[in-house]
Amino acid sequence: MYIIFSSIFAGFILGFLIRVFLGRLSLLDLEKNLTKVRVESQLEIENERRQIIANAKSQMLKEKNQQDRDIRDRKNEIVNLEKRLLQREETLDKRISALDKQQSRVDFKIKEFEQKEKVIREKEADLVKRLENISGLTREDARKIVIEKVEHESRRDAQVIINKSEQEAQLLADKVAKDILVSTMQRIVTEVSSEFTVASVELPNDEMKGRIIGKEGRNIRALETLIGADIIIDDTPEAVVISCFDPIRKELAKRTLERLVTDGRIHPARIEEVVYNVTNEINSIIQEEGEKVVFDLNIHGLDKRLIRGLGRLYFRSSYGQNVLSHSKETAIIGEILAKEMKLDPIVVKRACLLHDIGKGMESISDNSEGHAITGAELAQSCGESEIVVNAIAAHHNEVKPESLEAIVVQIADAISASRPGARRESLNNYINRLKRLEDIAYSFEGVQKCYAIQAGREVRIIVDNALINDEKSILLARDIAKKIEAEMRYPGKIKVTIIRETRVIEYAR
């Protein structure tokens, strides 16, 4: 038993020793491996260090070489710049030297010219003195004579050129205007009616006058109060005269009297009834006439106020010419002229029809010149275009025409108004206009006598030949014509004729 235990213990000891030995062997191998790994790592690290150092040295060498090359290039560039600067300095020096020489020559020539100029002035002064001694005139007198001569010759030459240009332009303008106007007038036919501010109503007998007057004048007072017209009952047999500046009220009075005379019942109540009925009739006529003229002229889109204003023109007259007929005629003429001149005929026709619309307003008198502005304001408030509004306002030159359409409206208006038989003037207006023409001519210096002839269509002026020569007579005619245009209003045109007579009388003995 002991032997067995001893054997086991001995075996255990032996096994432990063997294990220790084997462990030491393994430890030695591990140490050898560690040492080997350490050595290899150190070698590898050393190799990498050497490689890094070598690469760094190589990179530094490359950079150093590059820097050296850059430095050499910059040095070369600086050297080249210095060479160019030196060349420029040399060039500038040469130029400065040349300029200095040139300046010296210029200074020398200036001094030379100044000396020559001084000599010339001295000689000129000497010559002027000699000329003054020879001619007996001073320098200023001679200059005035030369200036007057040059001015006279220049005026004469300028007047010749102006006259020639005016003649050529007048011939061309007359031809074109005649062609257009002849073509226009051939295509228009209008009815003309002259009206007055006085109307008469025929009576069946003179007894009717008493009935119209009524007891204590009640009937005639009622008529005049309701209508606003003067009813004149005088010695005129079988007639009553109606006087009223407003043609609508005149027409109302005439129709009312005719209705009352035909009916035979004349008293204030009946008068009031008839006036009411006739007023409605006239309002209907105003509306119908306005719509009729718009339809006849094929004009669309007019405001109701404008149509009614046109209808009121049916009862109005200007210088005896019916204003609605005149407006319609002007529209037809304007449309034809617009087509001839390649303008918009619709716009021109519209403006021509409405050009006297201001006379259709109750606050404007028949021949008032303010109707143009008032009519333009009405047209603008009714939505008419700016061209139409300006044409209405400018047709009497109260404002400046801003379009060719406005000029055409003026021309068409003048053609309709100035043709023979279109208008009549009162005797006072006629005499005053002739007197005004003569007064304008007498306001100019040198006018001896003046005669307005041909119903004011021509002014013949006799001038003093000592004050007015041939050239001044042309200017005088132009100035008188301009003053007439500025201060007077008239249809058509007025001819200004200057007569200058030189009469020499000598007796043979």
UniProtKB/Swiss-Prot annotation:
GO MF assignments: RNA binding; RNA endonuclease activity
GO biological process, one term: mRNA catabolic process
Domain HD: 323-418
InterPro entries to which the protein is assigned, alphabetical: HD/PDEase_dom, HD_domain, HDIG_dom, KH_dom, KH_dom_type_1, KH_dom_type_1_sf, Ribonuclease_Y, RNase_Y_N
Compartment list: Cell membrane
Record-level GO cellular component terms: plasma membrane
Bilayer topology annotation: Single-pass membrane protein
SMART domains the record matches: HDc, KH
Group of enzyme by EC: hydrolase
Enzyme Commission number(s) of this protein: 3.1.-.-
PROSITE patterns documented for this protein: HD, KH_TYPE_1
Chief place of localization: membrane
Pfam families membership: HD (PF01966), KH_1 (PF00013), RNase_Y_N (PF12072)
Biological function: Endoribonuclease that initiates mRNA decay.
Family: Belongs to the RNase Y family.
HAMAP family linked to this entry: RNase_Y
Protein name: Ribonuclease Y
Organism for this UniProt entry: Borreliella afzelii (strain PKo) (Borrelia afzelii)
